[in-house]
Amino acid sequence: MIAVGSRAGAMESANDTTVRLYGYGTYVGYRMHPQWEVENPCIELDGGGVVFGIECWWGSEQKIRDSINGREVVIVPPPDRSP
């Protein structure tokens, strides 16, 4: 687990050739997910929006950068939580 206020990254998915990346931002601790009404790790993304741990693969920014390991990166928008 990383400390609140630390840099973090979040991936939607990955395979052998491609990483679908929500982006990088700040880990802000546990927050209430607006739809599932459960507290979950929350990352405020630099590009705007938030992503919750239950919606992605996440970790420290360095860990995520290292895990990309030369694969193509496709930036994807944060999850749409509109009804």
Where are these regions (language model features)?
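Short beta-strand-centered aromatic/proline hotspots
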Residues: 17-32
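Intrinsically disordered, low-complexity, charged/polar segments
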Residues: 40-83
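Residues that form ligand- and interface-recognition hot spots within folded domains
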Residues: 12, 31, 47
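Hydrophobic beta-strand residues in large extracellular and virion-surface proteins
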Residues: 8, 25-27, 43
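Short coil-to-beta transition motif at edge beta-strands of beta-rich domains
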Residues: 1-20
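Glycine-rich, flexible loop segments associated with nucleotide phosphate handling
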Residues: 21-24, 37-42
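A short, compositionally biased
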Residues: 3-5, 35-40
